[in-house]
Amino acid sequence: MQKEVNIIGAGLAGCEAAYLLANNGVKVNLFEVKSLMKNDIQKTNDLGELVCSNTLRSKSKKNAAGILKNEMKLLNSLVIKAALENEIPGDDALSVDRFGFSKYITDKIKNHKNINLIEQEVSEVDYTKVTIIASGPLTTDKLGKNIELMTGNEKLFFLDASAPIITKDSIDFNKVYWASRHNDGKDGQYICIPLNEEQFNAFVEELKNAETIKLKSFEKEIYFKGCQPIEQIAKTSKKVLLNGPLSPNNLIDENGNTPFAVVQLRQDDAIDSLYNFVGFQTNIKWPEQKRILQTLPGLENLNIVRFGVMHKNYYINSPKLLNRSLQVKRNKNIFFAGQITGVEGYIESASSGILTAINVLAYLNNIKIEQPSRKSMLGALNFYITNPKHDKLKPMKCNLGILDQQNKNAKSEFYSFDESEREIRRFIKGINNFAKIGENNE
């Protein structure tokens, strides 16, 4: 009899898990509610929708994100395939056309013989069936309450935000220039809006005094560091702005000058018609967003196609609830994957789906496996979110600091990259008696 698994949520983690399990002959019932009820930041009915930035971060072998993406590629990641098929210029980052990216994933999932996409809300988890909960940081209220009953723990949360997107043809190119921090060629350059000190100070004052959407009384201002609203940063420190989203470093204009501050715009789609603000996540009210952004040089007549929004991201207290296999300690049939586990970011969420699916496959075959070690980014993230020494989990992006780098002073500048690749290849070899990882498995 064909083995069967339920997966709740068809975001990046859910789709990765479904893809791997289906490629290994498991029948997957993939539940997704977005075609019936979208949350505040979902815009399309496609699966694997990128709701915040359109970049999967750095491609560098020296960077944690580059290391993790290489590990995912070795594990036949659907998300990495979709990204490479829909890549657009983005300096040293893997930037994608978000619509083509999601369509690629949707087509792969819908056309897979072993995946049954069920468009309905799951309000109660069937504990008698092997299930992966990958419902994401915006889990519906009904399912969220059911998860709370199952875990016996309060859910944690942080506030996340996304940046506005504007049309390229509404930019006055007489007042902006093209530049890149990491790439001297034309490809991958960003649109740069130069600000002198007076303009910078005026813009900061606008941000500090902007009218924001009021938080509910029970929503304390708990932000994830990588997604702090721009207005919150402005209230904190001008220096942080100048060293962060408005940094002018290496953004030299056509006259060879470096402005006091720079606002960057990054290409958002394949046909080069849309651009998003780099590092400009915001909770400012929509009319205020337009008014304030129009004070920037070259954006006097800007056309905003998507305003920045803030939303609450839920996640469970994984160290108390899950074992190393991302399996609920008190109910072995239930597994979690994605941002709801406490990883933060697109690739972190997707990679979590891959690892959870491998653990589910092992469970279905009654096989105990050794998890990837902390020499790999995948193993390090898994160790971090399931480490019982954490009293209260804080969301985590991949970073070099969580790796086990015993010989990090080794001569090779690509030591961490090489070590992680060796570890993932070792991991794949250790599971090849029951899990097939590769192209010929679709």
Curated annotation (Swiss-Prot):
Gene Ontology biological process terms in this record: tRNA methylation; tRNA wobble uridine modification
One Gene Ontology molecular-function label: tRNA (uracil(54)-C5)-methyltransferase activity, 5,10-methylenetetrahydrofolate-dependent
Predominant subcellular localization, coarse grouping: cytoplasm
Catalytic reaction list: uridine(54) in tRNA + (6R)-5,10-methylene-5,6,7,8-tetrahydrofolate + NADH + H(+) = 5-methyluridine(54) in tRNA + (6S)-5,6,7,8-tetrahydrofolate + NAD(+); uridine(54) in tRNA + (6R)-5,10-methylene-5,6,7,8-tetrahydrofolate + NADPH + H(+) = 5-methyluridine(54) in tRNA + (6S)-5,6,7,8-tetrahydrofolate + NADP(+)
UniProt keyword NADP present: yes
GO cellular component terms listed in the entry, alphabetical order: cytosol
Enzyme Commission code: 2.1.1.74
Superkingdom, natural source: Bacteria
Protein keywords: Cytoplasm, FAD, Flavoprotein, Methyltransferase, NAD, NADP, Transferase, tRNA processing
Cofactor(s) it depends on: FAD
Subcellular localization(s) per the UniProt record: Cytoplasm
Binding-site positions, FAD: 9-14
Stated role: Catalyzes the folate-dependent formation of 5-methyl-uridine at position 54 (M-5-U54) in all tRNAs.
Family classification: Belongs to the MnmG family. TrmFO subfamily.
Protein name: Methylenetetrahydrofolate--tRNA-(uracil-5-)-methyltransferase TrmFO 1
Organism per entry: Mesoplasma florum (strain ATCC 33453 / NBRC 100688 / NCTC 11704 / L1) (Acholeplasma florum)
Species lineage: Bacteria, Bacillati, Mycoplasmatota, Mollicutes, Entomoplasmatales
